[in-house]
């Protein structure tokens, strides 16, 4: 059977993800109302995505930047209508990695991705407690000399774990809508009433 599958893959010149791997992406495709702002969630965050994000971001496997959105190229048409603004890594993390993961991921949709935020302190959110994460508004700042195009604003991020970063950014930039690649199952569960 695997020989047949491999033979079929031979005919897909632009295939970035094999059909077996593609099945591991747990589609969620849900819209949440967060204080009157729509938040679009593409995937449910799970162990597969956790490993993939780690390999991409921390092991600097930059070729993976295209796999997250390659099967959702219909988003290009939608994203082009907006000024796409992403959340940022800390300066230290950006220097260590040598790239800005969210910018590169969303740039795969052929849109220019703005980076109007900065982190006042270097805080690793994945190891922070929920109460520390809720204080992200004290850590996130908006660049003063960073003019944005006169378009509707789409705020994007890679993962929504508790939603604290998105809420802090929302207060600073007042987006028309928000989009994340993946949301943590606990966040999804806690926000069922916001669908």
Please provide the spans of the model-predicted regions:
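Cofactor-binding loop segments of dinucleotide-utilizing enzymes, especially the Rossmann-like FAD-
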Residues: 158, 180-183
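Short, well-ordered alpha-helices that flank and scaffold nucleotide-derived cofactor binding pockets
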Residues: 107-111, 167-174
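Acidic, divalent-metal-coordinating active-site segment for phosphoryl/phosphodiester hydrolysis
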Residues: 159-169
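Metal-dependent phosphoesterase core characteristic of DEDDh/y 3'-5' exonuclease domains
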Residues: 113-116
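Residue-level marker for buried hydrophobic side chains located in beta-strands
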Residues: 153-155
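Short cysteine-rich clusters marking metal-coordination/redox-active sites
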Residues: 1-9, 18-21
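Flanking scaffold residues of small Cys/His-coordinated metal-binding clusters
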Residues: 13
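Active-site-facing substrate-recognition patch
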Residues: 17-83, 91-96, 100, 107, ...
